[in-house]
Structure formats: C-alpha cells, structure tokens
Amino acid sequence: MILEARDISFSYERKGAELFSNIKFKVENNERVWVPGPSGYGKTTLCKILAGYLEPCKGQILLDGKPLPKKGYCPVQMIWQHPERAVNPRLKMENILSDGGQVENRIIEGLGIEEDWLNRYPQELSGGELQRFCIARALGK
C-alpha cells in the first residue's frame, strides 16, 4: 500500500492562517516515518488528516491512488498517545478489539494480550495493557 499526501493544506478556520500548506509525500509499504517538531506545529493534525479524521482545506489523501473511504472502516489507523481516551469505557475489551475488524491471533499473542483481559472493562486494565489493545485494534482487518 502507498499512502500519499498531495498538496495538502489545513487551517482550523477556513479562511484563517494555515497551520501547514502544500505538503506532499508518499509512504511506501513497510516504510516507517517520523514527524518531529515542537508542540503546536500540526503533527497530530497532520496525522488526523492522514487517517481520515479531518479533511484538508486543500489537496487530497490517497491510499493506493484512491481517496480514503468516507464511511465505514478506514485502513489508515492512528494509535493515540492516551489509550484511555481512545476506547469506550462502557464496552468490554473484546468488543473494543473487534472495532478494528478481525485481529489475527499472532498479533494478540505477540502483544502479550491475555485471554482473561478480553472480559474486562478499560478501567480494569493498566495503561500499558490498554495500549496493547489499541495497537492490536489498529492492526486489525
């Protein structure tokens, strides 16, 4: 898969100052990317656009040459820094995990997710245990 940003620009107010403009890049399959910068410079906003949470003011995001889906599952996933804010506290972990579609057993085992954790609620897990579920969910489908 190739994730491509084509000339994307963004501002929080449609006619306000741009947070960033005309960004272009491609991320190839199995390539890792690092986005450094101080707080407030748009790193998280850029990631939200790449994952389809926000729309750019200009430009487009493509996955294998096609726009990201507007509805349903998006194959571009974001793993949030604070896992407790990324899950529904009313759902058991088994349901939260299935939000990402089918997660392979090798991923669950590789992350060290224990079977009895599946029947717990998020607040019954440590931050590290909860983050493992968020990573597994992002790797699903």
Where are these regions (language model features)?
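Conserved ABC transporter NBD signature motif
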Residues: 59-72, 103
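Q-loop/switch helix immediately C-terminal to the Walker
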Residues: 82, 89-104
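Conserved ABC ATPase "signature" region
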Residues: 103-116
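The feature captures the beta-strand-to-loop junction immediately N-terminal to the Walker
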Residues: 36-38
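Helix-to-loop junction immediately C-terminal to a conserved catalytic motif
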Residues: 51
